[in-house]
A protein has these predicted regions:
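Short, Asp-centered acidic motifs that coordinate Mg2+ and/or phosphate
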Residues: 67
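Short glycine-rich anion-binding loops that position phosphate/pyrophosphate groups of nucleotides
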Residues: 15, 48-49, 73-76, 146, ...
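A cross-family phosphate/adenosyl-ligand binding-site feature
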Residues: 2-59, 63-64
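Alpha-helix C-terminal capping segments
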Residues: 56-62, 89-100
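Glycine/threonine-rich flexible loop motifs
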Residues: 76-85
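Short beta-strand segments
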Residues: 11-12, 70-73, 104-105, 141-144, ...
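Electrostatically charged, flexible surface regions
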Residues: 116-240
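Glycine-rich phosphate/pyrophosphate-binding loops
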Residues: 95-117
Length: 240
C-alpha cells in the first residue's frame, strides 16, 4: 500500500475472527506502539477490528484519512460470512466516516501467498480509487488460492464483480466431550455452499476467480418500508 500513499497500521493485538462489528465501550481501550528495532510499524489495539478503525481515525492516524484497507485476512469473507466478518466490519466502520473503505481477504491455505494477494489487491484498489465519484464507498475483495498461483505464473486472474451470496451454509457442528463429560461443539464449514441460479461471490471464488462486491451498511428494506408505512399499526389506547 505504500505505493499508493502514507500507511498507518492499526491492528488488533489478538485474534479476532468472527467477531463481526463488535466494539468496546464498557471497558477502556488500550493500545501500544509496535517497533521493529528503530522502525515504527504501527499500533496494536486490545480491541476488535471495528475498534481499530474507530480509534485509529479519531486518535491515532494523521488527518485527513483518505482510505481504509482492512486485511489481508487469512480466510475468505464471502456470502453470508460477510455478516460475521471482523475484516468486513472494519471496512464498514471506515465507511461510517464517509471514507472509501475496502476489505481484502485471501483463501485459507497452508501455503497462502500473501505477497501475490497484496499485489493483486493494490492494483484493484488503485482502479477502485480511480472511480471515487461512484456512489459506493465500501467494497469487499476476495482472492482465492488459484488466483495467486495464476498470478505467480504470469497469468492475470479473472476479476468478477458480483453480489454476495445469501444461501445458508456451514451450519453443522462437531459434538465432543471434555474429560469431565461436558459437551462442547466445534463449528464447521459443512455442508458447503451449493450452486445457485444466479452468479454470486461464493460461486465465482469456488471457480478460482477474484471477486469484488460493493456493499452498503444501510440495512433498511426500502421496498418493505414503503409497504409497511401503509399498514394500520396504531395501538389501542388502554392502560394495563
Amino acid at each position: 500500500l505504500e505505493s499508493i500513499g502514507r500507511v498507518t497500521v492499526v491492528a488488533p493485538a489478538t485474534e479476532q475472527s468472527g467477531v463481526g462489528h463488535s466494539i468496546t465501550y464498557l471497558t477502556p481501550l488500550t493500545c501500544k506502539q509496535i517497533y521493529d528495532g528503530e522502525i515504527f510499524r504501527g499500533w496494536a489495539v486490545d480491541g476488535s477490528p471495528a475498534d481499530c478503525v474507530k480509534l485509529g481515525i479519531s486518535e491515532l492516524t494523521p488527518k485527513p484519512t483518505d482510505l481504509i484497507v482492512s486485511g489481508i485476512n487469512g480466510g475468505l469473507n464471502a456470502g453470508i460470512n460477510v455478516l460475521y466478518s471482523g475484516t468486513v466490519a472494519a471496512a464498514i466502520e471506515g465507511a461510517f466516516f464517509r471514507i472509501p473503505s475496502i476489505a481484502v481477504s485471501l483463501e485459507e491455505d497452508p501455503h497462502a501467498d500473501f505477497e501475490a494477494a497484496a499485489s493483486i489487491a493494490v492494483q484493484l484498489i488503485q482502479r477502485i480509487l480511480h472511480h471515487q465519484g461512484s456512489a459506493a464507498r465500501l467494497y469487499n475483495i476476495n482472492i482465492p488460492t488459484k488466483a495467486t498461483r495464476d498470478y505467480r505464473a504470469g497469468l492475470a486472474p479473472e476479476i468478477h464483480v458480483l453480489p454476495m451470496g445469501v444461501a445458508r451454509y456451514g451450519d453443522h457442528y462437531i459434538k465432543r466431550q471434555d474429560p469431565k463429560g461436558r459437551n462442547y461443539y466445534w463449528s464447521t464449514n459443512d455442508p458447503p455452499p451449493q450452486p445457485t441460479e444466479h452468479p454470486t461471490d461464493v460461486m465465482a471464488l469456488a471457480n478460482g476467480h477474484v471477486t469484488i462486491t460493493p456493499l452498503h451498511f444501510d440495512m433498511t428494506h426500502q421496498q418493505q418500508l414503503s409497504e409497511m408505512q401503509s399498514w394500520s399499526l396504531a395501538l389501542d389506547s388502554q392502560s394495563l
